[in-house]
Each structure stands twice: as structure tokens, then as C-alpha cells.
Design a protein with these regions (language model features):
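Membrane-embedded alpha-helical signal segments
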Residues: 1-174
Length: 174
């Protein structure tokens, strides 16, 4: 999201499903827009810190790490950056699968909401290489599906083939 404050352009980055848009708006964007004078990372921390956990962003790796952990990253005109924690809360509780028994690992099950499911995957795979490709399947139901892969690990040709086959599905509902 790009915002203007006191003639300065500020960019706010976040990952959909991992941050609360209302908290982002109320506790980060609004205080930044109400600032007196030019903004940088240090002043932004002072303005926002009473509402959200914040820290300076040191480099691109730090920014990516913050993004995949439920923070928003704010970039200022001079190249300065800060991150603020605005994690989202769950909608319907993610519970243990009723049909599948697991011995090791997470005991989470997907819900009906694709956004909740993709954020669940992101919480377990906190790598910037995780790729989520969204598509719509079904002529009438227009069901959102997400193809997940990890760049550098997943066979790219296989991902393209699955994506193509999803796009070719001709069905009323899914």
C-alpha cells in the first residue's frame, strides 16, 4: 500500500492473511499519516510503538523475515525502514484433523476459508521461497484454489503442469 503523509510517499508492505488489516490501519497507517513533519524509521517507531511492537529493519533479509512472521514493513523516502507486529487473529479455530491421525508434526487441519489456510501454511513454512498461486475454478461456484510450492525445491515444470491442469478444469462447482 502506498500512502502520502506531509508530501512524503511511504510504502507499507504486508502479507495478506498474516496481518490484521484493521490493526494495520488503526495502529500503523493512521499514526504515520498524523505525523508532524518528515518521517523516518526512528520517528515512526516513536509514533507507533505504543500500539504495536516495532523495530528498525536493517536489510532486505530482515524485512522478508519480518513479513513472513506477521509484521508489516514500512519503507520511507530516504530508504529507512521499520517493521510493526500486526498479526491477525484466527477466525474459526484451526483444530486437529478428525479423520487423519498424525504421530509427529503439527496437528492442524484446514478450514473452509482459503485465506486462513494459506496463512496456516505460511506460519509453518516461514520461508520467502514459498510461492502461492491463486486461481479460480468452477463456472458457477468460482472457487478460489491456491497452488503452493517452494522455489528452488519444487520442480518448476511440475508446478506449471499442475497450474495448467487447474486452469483447464471445466466444471460448474468445486
Amino acid at each position: 500500500r502506498k500512502i502520502r503523509s506531509r508530501g512524503q510517499t511511504i510504502r507499507v508492505y504486508s502479507i495478506d492473511g498474516l496481518v490484521s488489516s484493521s490493526e494495520l490501519s488503526d495502529f500503523v497507517v493512521k499514526p504515520l499519516m498524523m505525523a508532524d513533519g518528515p518521517l523516518d524509521g526512528e520517528l515512526a517507531e516513536e509514533l507507533v510503538i505504543y500500539n504495536a511492537v516495532g523495530s528498525r529493519v536493517l536489510d532486505m533479509d530482515d524485512a522478508v523475515s519480518k513479513l513472513v512472521n506477521g509484521f508489516c514493513v514500512v519503507l520511507f523516502a530516504e530508504g529507512d525502514a521499520a517493521a510493526f507486529e500486526v498479526k491477525t487473529g484466527e477466525k474459526r479455530g484451526i483444530s486437529q484433523p478428525e479423520v487423519e491421525n498424525t504421530i509427529k508434526g503439527a496437528k492442524d487441519a484446514f478450514t473452509e476459508t482459503v485465506r486462513t489456510n494459506t496463512s496456516l501454511v505460511r506460519r509453518h513454512l516461514r520461508t520467502p521461497e514459498l510461492r502461492l498461486e491463486e486461481q479460480v475454478v468452477g463456472r458457477r461456484s468460482l472457487t478460489n484454489v491456491t497452488l503452493c510450492s517452494i522455489a528452488g525445491i519444487t520442480n518448476h515444470a511440475l508446478v506449471e503442469a499442475v497450474s495448467r491442469r487447474l486452469a483447464e478444469i471445466e466444471i460448474d462447482g468445486m
